[in-house]
């Protein structure tokens, strides 16, 4: 489904290069009003994604320090340290952050590959290589209460009655799959900062979707196969699902490998928070540079580092405020405050927002190539495939809406969680009404909305 979306997305990226990727693409395809609405919703998503990852970074860091040395620093202190370090990365040249992210990615891929191929060479665990774990059809089937994992004879038996796992499991499984892939589309965000964006961005996007998608599917398959069907379900439904992967490392690579796993899950969560920080700050910058009141601050870049330093500092401040609010409300319990609420609630909020923007972007691709005919476009790659992508995204949104209470787990009863659809809707409405107001008061400014692109002159018409 994401590949279908990516086909249309990269078709647009070959012609339009802009820091506010969704904002610019949708403005070019569907007009400024929809572009502004999408820009604000996308910004909301990336802003809360950093807060979400800061929460889980704090959780994993405290857990690792406790496991290694028996110390448990306050999660809020760890969160502040993470926010400050990310703020420093965001202030300087993007190449510094890119180098750090690259090192983290390579290290994680190598470690995961070592585990996965070891399991493969062993032929899996007691249940062998479980084919049902990678059957895409099973992603849309609920796990039967007390039943079997598809493709395996292993039963849950009495250890899990199945109701908690079965209820909405397909919908939530698909949702978390999308949450795991969020961020691949940010390749286009860095187009203006790359040397040859029209050559680099399209393949980078497809590699992120297809290449890493195949790799992570393989790794997940090996983790499930190595652990066994029954144990995999029990562990995944337990209080610490990460133990599924960590236990596989312990069993097949030896206990010392779990230390590397612990370290890389801390650096990995930090790297994800950094990546979302960079995306959020560039969306804030893209919106700011087109609005006169913000052009000299949010819309400015650093004279030496060429980074959107004010937008970056603003994003760091927003994340700090979000974290303070969760700490003030939930206290020092790292599981409740950092993991269940800051990480979990904000992840659902951001994913819902970004899914809607992706669906709208697919429609914008069709409009840009097939209706407005700004550029000649293949009917398959800029018409049929984006249409299928949009339908798929909207279907996932429907699944999420239909199973929203299940997705939130222990946090689903909170007021913030119940307000998620309204927060997304209100953000979009502010964008729509704000743009219409600008259109009525300043037509010249309205014409520039979403049109700041690194492109030929006709893209700005």
Task: Label the model's feature ranges.
Residues 2-83, 88-91, 96, 266-269, ...:
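Hydrophobic transmembrane alpha-helices that form the core helical bundles
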Residues 24-25, 31, 63-67, 144, ...:
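TM-loop-TM module centered on a large, flexible mid-protein loop between adjacent transmembrane helices
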Residues 24-27, 54-77, 106, 111-114, ...:
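Helix-loop-helix connectors at the membrane interface of multi-pass transporters/channels
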Residues 18, 41-56, 181, 185-193, ...:
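Membrane-helix boundary/coupling elements in multi-pass transport proteins
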Residues 362-385, 403-461:
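Terminal cytosolic tails of multi-pass membrane transporters
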Residues 75-138, 178, 182, 204-212, ...:
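Membrane-interface loop-to-helix entry segments
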Residues 64-75, 94-105, 260-264, 321-360, ...:
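Transmembrane helix-loop boundary segments of multi-pass membrane transporters
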Residues 70-74, 106-262:
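Helix-loop-helix junctions that connect adjacent transmembrane segments
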């Amino acid at each position: 489904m994401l590949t279908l979306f990516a086909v249309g997305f990269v078709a647009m990226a070959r012609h339009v290069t802009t820091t506010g990727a969704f904002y610019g693409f949708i403005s070019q395809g569907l007009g400024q009003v929809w572009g502004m609405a999408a820009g604000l919703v996308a910004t909301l998503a990336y802003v809360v994604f950093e807060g979400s990852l800061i929460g889980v970074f704090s959780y994993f860091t405290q857990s690792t320090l406790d496991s290694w040395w028996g110390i448990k620093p306050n999660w809020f202190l760890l969160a502040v340290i993470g926010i400050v370090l990310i703020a420093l990365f965001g202030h300087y040249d993007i190449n510094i952050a890119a180098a750090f992210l690259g090192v983290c990615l390579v290290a994680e891929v190598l470690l995961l590959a070592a585990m996965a191929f070891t399991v493969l060479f062993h032929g899996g665990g007691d249940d062998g290589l479980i084919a049902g774990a990678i059957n895409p059809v099973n992603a849309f089937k609920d796990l039967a209460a007390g039943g079997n994992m598809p493709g395996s004879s292993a039963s849950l038996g009495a250890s899990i009655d199945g109701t908690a796992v079965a209820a909405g499991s397909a919908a939530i499984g698909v949702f978390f799959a999308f949450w795991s892939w969020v961020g691949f589309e940010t390749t286009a965000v860095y187009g203006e900062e790359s040397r040859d964006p029209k050559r680099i961005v399209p393949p980078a996007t497809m590699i992120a979707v297809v290449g890493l998608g195949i790799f992570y599917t393989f790794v997940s398959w090996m983790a499930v196969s190595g652990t066994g069907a029954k144990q995999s379900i029990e562990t995944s439904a337990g209080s610490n699902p990460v133990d599924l992967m960590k236990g596989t490392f312990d069993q097949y690579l030896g206990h010392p490998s779990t230390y590397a796993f612990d370290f890389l899950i801390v650096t990995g969560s930090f790297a994800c928070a950094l990546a979302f920080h960079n995306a959020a700050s560039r969306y804030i910058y893209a919106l700011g540079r087109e609005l006169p009141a913000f052009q000299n601050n949010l819309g400015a870049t650093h004279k030496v580092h060429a980074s959107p330093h004010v937008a970056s500092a603003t994003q760091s401040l927003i994340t700090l405020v979000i974290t303070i609010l969760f700490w003030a409300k939930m206290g020092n319990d790292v599981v409740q405050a950092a993991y269940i609420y800051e990480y979990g609630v904000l992840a659902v909020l951001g994913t819902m927002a970004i899914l809607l923007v992706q669906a709208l972007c697919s429609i914008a691709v069709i409009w840009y190539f097939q209706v407005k005919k700004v550029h000649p476009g293949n009917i398959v790659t800029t018409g049929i495939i984006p249409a299928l992508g949009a339908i798929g995204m909207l279907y996932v949104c429907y699944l999420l809406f239909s199973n929203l209470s299940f997705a939130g787990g222990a946090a689903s009863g909170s007021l913030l969680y119940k307000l998620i659809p309204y927060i997304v809707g209100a953000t979009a409405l502010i964008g729509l009404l704000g743009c219409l107001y600008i259109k009525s008061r300043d037509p010249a400014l309205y014409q520039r909305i979403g049109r700041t692109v690194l492109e030929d002159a006709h893209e700005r018409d």
